[in-house]
Amino acid sequence: MKKTLLLLLLVGGLAYGQKEMPSVSLKTTENKTVNVKTDFAEKDKIYVFAFWATWCTPCIKELEAINEHYADWSKELNMEVVAVSIDDSRTEKRVKPLLNGKKWPYTVLLDSNQNLKRALSIANVPYTIIVKNGAVVHVHNGYNQGGETELYNTLKSL
């Protein structure tokens, strides 16, 4: 009985701790407007929102490391990476040239006014948010070499 009660409290606490994605509209690099809540809402699909900037070396290393596994992960885990650039109006012009050189397969969104960053209370980058069925199920701040393995294990557990 005690174990059952503890399990219910734990599961209830986890469910309560999940935050919904905010309804924020951003532009893609092709100038198309998308809403992060409604346009990334396929049932049971996992969305990895990776917040980054052109001036952030760890951010670029993280996106490069994920890219090495992306084709396999996206098939195996039914997941998609959405790279959200927080470059402001001064540095946003560097995003497209960097993307042209990297050839990342990700959807890239521009948060130049940092509306999504603020709505999610993100202090600094790199910052990764995992969303499933509209709820934020995991967050991670920072990147160290090999961090993609931790990300993969987290994705597998979902």
Residues covered by each model-derived region:
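Thiol-/selenol-based redox modules, centered on thioredoxin-like
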Residues: 129-158
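Short, internal strand/loop/helix patches
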Residues: 96-131
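Boundary of Sec targeting at the N-terminus
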Residues: 16-19
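Hydrophobic beta-strand anchors of alpha/beta hydrolase catalytic cores
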Residues: 48-49, 81, 128
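A short beta-strand-turn-helix
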Residues: 25-46
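Sec-dependent N-terminal signal peptides
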Residues: 4-13
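Short pre-active-site segment immediately N-terminal to redox-active cysteine/selenocysteine motifs
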Residues: 44-47, 51-55, 124
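Structural microenvironment flanking redox-active thiols in thiol-disulfide oxidoreductases
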Residues: 61-101, 115-116
